[in-house]
Each structure stands twice: as C-alpha cells, then as structure tokens.
C-alpha cells in the first residue's frame, strides 16, 4: 500500500511539474470526488505542497538539478534546496 501511494505521489509530481495539469484543476477534482473530512484535507494539502516546489526541490534534494542550473545561470552561485524552495548561495545551517 505504501509503495503504491509513493508511486502515485511521484507520478503526480511529474504530471504537475510539466504543466499538463495545474494545482487548480487537481484541487477541483478532489473537491468533486472526495467527501469532506480528514482524507480530503490531507490530499489537498499534499497537492498544494507539491505544487509549491521550486525548480524540482523536494525534501532538501533537487532531483533533476534544476535548482543548481537556475542559480548558476542567474547568480553564478550554488543552488541549494531548502525543503521545497531553491535558494542561491545560502547553505543549510541544520
């Protein structure tokens, strides 16, 4: 069960990152298909967090190295993921 859920999450990240489906469309489908409650709220929160990801950053890792490329091209600094955000030249202090 956990493996299937993880695969679905990563497939969702891929689809959303390429812009085929936007966060707004996914949130609308969740509103229509899921009953109000914990599961709906959790699913909407996961979709929102994944949609906020910058330059492929997830869990402090830039999976496709877009953060590094972005920072090298704009500021000539190292790109470092801080959670879901990409920061140029700011090392993690934890």
Swiss-Prot record:
Tell me the ranges covered by the BetaSPN-type CS-alpha/beta domain, including all copies.
Answer: 54-94
- Signal peptide range equals 1-18
Give the primary localization class.
secreted
Alphabetical GO CC annotations of the entry are:
extracellular region
Disulfide cross-links: 57-81, 67-86, 71-88
Name the GO terms of the biological process aspect.
Answer: defense response to bacterium; defense response to fungus; killing of cells of another organism
| UniProt-listed Pfam families | Scorpion_toxin_alpha-beta
What does the protein in this record do? Has antibacterial activity.
- Protein name according to UniProt: Scorpine-like-1
């Amino acid at each position: 069960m956990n493996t299937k859920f993880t695969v679905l999450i990563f497939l969702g990240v891929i689809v959303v990152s390429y812009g085929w489906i936007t966060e707004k469309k996914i949130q609308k489908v969740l509103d229509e298909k899921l009953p109000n409650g914990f599961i709906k709220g959790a699913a909407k929160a996961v979709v929102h967090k994944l949609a906020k990801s910058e330059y492929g950053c997830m869990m402090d890792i830039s999976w496709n190295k877009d953060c590094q490329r972005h920072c090298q091209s704009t500021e000539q600094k190292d790109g470092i993921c801080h959670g879901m955000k990409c920061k140029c030249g700011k090392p993690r202090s934890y």
